[in-house]
From Swiss-Prot:
Pfam families: Intron_maturas2, MatK_N. The keyword tRNA processing applies. One of its GO terms (molecular function) is RNA binding. Belongs to the intron maturase 2 family. MatK subfamily. Disulfide bonds: none annotated. This is Maturase K. The keyword Cytoplasm does not apply. Keywords: Chloroplast, mRNA processing, Plastid, RNA-binding, tRNA processing.
Length: 506
């Protein structure tokens, strides 16, 4: 990311922190091209030797300012193949340019905030998906109620642009961004549909994720502000917090509104044990106190989304459940708090007492049914979990087939090694192992029994079960009791930055 700092310093020396001139700089598109964000979008089929042209991008931006930018004469089309109708291709080119330009200043703010907080070395571990589970193990065993909330959408992109204006002061840049969204992404309708959002997110994934994250960051900043105002203890876990234009004015307005209209209700929101976790398009709100406080926070969220972001959310879609009686889905796992009861005999002088001790433990379980559904969708088994062959891979060599199955098995084992019960994970491994055997038997045009006799059933494909033990034996002492104990306990890996489709099938 050193290129970001160089390009922003170059732009500062010319245009006083404005982002608009960066749209017309060739190194911006070269940066997107070299990082392989989407290499195919910079390639035109005719006459460009697999290279993009900044001149064509500038011409397209110029035509965006014209009312008849889609009316292209036949002469222009004959002279230059660029002006043939290929709306999606060049909208993606400009979308990459927008995403790169607008990410530059915020990445620098993020890196400076991390350096000031002295957590730059552990930032990669914090980014890991598995980093949230140790937090849940430490905190959720002391909580009683949980609310699983789906962040509402669709939201009109005009609102996202207005949110972005709180951070950046470049008016021409936002004017061009609005033109791009309205002319190329079909955002002329007043209420966007889920289909239009899905189309835009697939054709412009980087820009869409950036704008969506701004929407989430905005409502979370307000939520954190309300949470801090409702209790005298300051929140210290959010050390990375950006300064925004007009934020203090907005905050003073919120203080005035809540002190005027909610002076008697705010003391009831003093809940020091409320915890908030966001993942993908959902968030979890957990608390130790009575459901009354959770219900108040639920309506806080609903009114915040409806009044501040014009996003409709139904109160009945947010349920409040007891942790001991409810399982919630989190990043491909089923999680709940289990009550462990034990009886201890205590003796005092001549009297003996039986004391019942109740302890809580967070259970994180592999969701076997969604995983089997994902394997069936990928044609590794049927809907009942019976392994089937993969004839599409039959043209590959035996080594490639085994390596493909091992890679899938290794990734699933790596991701689900934090499960408290490994039986479901072993079942998934067994399905993949038999599917691999059936695929090889199908390739060699023989039955499974004949193929196993020929290759040796005792030693064939033992890597499906022995690879994990070999890795653990390199990390921990070669003691059978130690390895058995680590098989029973959870192991979280802090190098997992994303989940694949098999994990994320909800």
């Amino acid at each position: 990311m050193k290129e970001y700092r160089v390009y922003l310093e170059r732009a500062r020396s010319r245009q006083q922190d404005f982002l608009y001139p960066l749209i017309f700089r060739e190194y911006i598109y070269g940066l997107a091209y070299s990082h392989n964000f989407n290499r195919s979008i910079f390639v035109e089929n005719g006459g460009y030797d697999n290279k993009y042209s900044l001149l064509n991008v500038k011409r397209l931006i110029t035509r965006m300012y014209q009312q008849n930018h889609l009316i292209i004469s036949a002469n222009d089309s004959n002279k230059n193949p660029f002006w043939g109708y290929n709306k999606n291709l060049y909208s993606q080119i400009i979308s990459e340019g927008f995403a790169i330009v607008v990410e530059i200043p915020f990445f620098l703010q993020l890196s400076s905030s991390l350096e000031e907080a002295e957590i730059i070395k552990s930032y990669k571990n914090v980014r890991s998906i598995h980093s949230v589970f140790p937090f849940l193990e430490d905190k959720f065993t002391y909580l009683n109620y949980v609310s699983d909330i789906r962040i509402p959408y669709p939201i009109h992109l005009e609102i996202l642009v207005q949110i972005l204006r709180y951070w950046v002061k470049d008016v021409p840049f936002f004017h061009l961004l609005r033109l791009f969204l309205y002319h190329f992404c079909n955002w002329n309708c007043f209420i966007p549909t889920k289909k239009s959002i899905s189309t835009f997110s697939k054709s412009n994934p980087r820009l869409f994720l950036f704008l969506y994250n701004f929407y989430v960051c905005e409502y979370e900043s307000i939520f954190l502000f309300l949470r801090n105002k409702s209790y005298h203890l300051r929140l210290k876990s959010f050390s990375v917090f950006f300064e925004r234009i007009f934020f203090y004015a907005k905050r003073e307005h919120l203080v005035e509104v809540f002190s005027k209209d909610f002076s008697y209700t705010l003391p009831f929101f003093k809940d020091p044990n409320i915890h908030y976790v966001r993942y993908q398009g959902k968030c979890i709100l957990a608390s130790k106190n009575v459901p009354f406080l959770m219900n108040k926070w639920k309506y806080y969220f609903i009114h915040l989304w409806q009044c501040f972001f014009d996003v409709w959310s139904q109160p009945r879609t947010i349920n409040i459940n007891q942790l001991s009686e409810h399982s919630f889905q989190l990043l491909g796992y089923f999680s709940n708090v289990r009550l462990n009861r034990s009886v201890v005999r205590s003796q005092m002088l001549q009297n003996t007492f039986l004391i019942e001790i109740v302890s809580k433990k967070l259970d994180i379980i592999v969701p076997i049914i969604p995983l089997i559904r994902s394997l069936a969708k990928a044609k590794f088994c049927n809907v009942l979990g019976h392994p089937i062959s993969k004839p599409v891979w039959a043209d590959s060599s035996d080594f490639d087939i085994i390596e493909r199955f091992l890679r899938i098995c290794r990734n699933l084992s790596h991701y689900y090694n934090g499960s408290s019960k490994k039986k479901s994970l072993y079942r998934i491994k067994y399905i993949l192992r038999l599917s691999c055997i059936k695929t090889l038997a199908c390739k060699h045009k023989s039955t499974v029994r004949t193929f196993l006799k020929r290759s040796g059933s005792e030693e064939f494909l033992e890597e499906f079960f022995t690879e994990e033990e070999e890795i653990l034996s390199l990390i921990f002492p070669r003691d059978s009791f130690t390895l058995h104990r680590f098989h029973r306990n959870r192991i979280w890996y802090l190098d997992i930055l994303f989940s694949n489709d098999l994990v994320n099938d909800e």
